Amino acid sequence: MQQLQIAHQLGLNPPRTIVTNNWQDARAFCSDIEKVCTKSLDEPNFILDGHIYPFFTRVLEKREIFENRESIERCPVLFQEYIDKMFDIRVCVIGEDIFAFEIHSQEHDLSVHDFRGVAPDFLKHTPHKLPGSVEARIRRFMQRQGLIFSAMDFVLSRKGTYHFLENNPNGQWLWLEQITGVPLSKSMLRLLFG
């Protein structure tokens, strides 16, 4: 939640978000928002009967919130405004270098809400030029967090607005180089070895 607060303060437009196990608060929050999603607070997988199952971002029907009071009150749940997007954007900050990539998640049914729903090789990835104002805010975010590397997730809404979703200070990035040919590893080597 801290990273969402910082992103909001810096004008990176994170979606409205609440983490709660209070059913009444969840209901009130979701009543005010057109489309709501939920996602894991921690590990994106869960184990049941020895099998690993992914828990990706999922859009909720409002009735699910209204009808599941007991489940919501058992443990904290993240509820977030769902942003209808043109595509996802993975931003890799490596030292002073910023790389951004469009991930065309809207082209497959299994990745519409979360690009992790489809193996990266099946999704179109293209380099993306961020506006200078967004890059400047990302640099301020990195300074505030004391980071020299990050893999950030954004979406570009259908209205043309960039929305910060999360910061992964140890996030994956090599697949982006393998798919697009953009030499991120050169920047990583410069960062590590000068």
Question: How should these model regions be labeled?
Answer:
Residues 16, 77-78, 149-152:
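A short linear hydrophobic-aromatic micro-motif
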Residues 31-128:
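Phosphate-binding site of ATP-dependent enzymes
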Residues 37, 151, 164:
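Generic enzyme active-site microenvironment
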Residues 16-21, 60:
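Short acidic-hydrophobic, aromatic-tinged amphipathic segments that line or gate anion-handling sites
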Residues 125-136, 140-147, 156-194:
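C-terminal active-site "lid" helix and adjoining low-complexity regulatory extension at the edge
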Residues 10-13, 144-149:
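Short secondary-structure junctions
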Residues 1-14, 25-28:
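Conserved N-proximal alpha/beta basic substrate-recognition cap immediately N-terminal to
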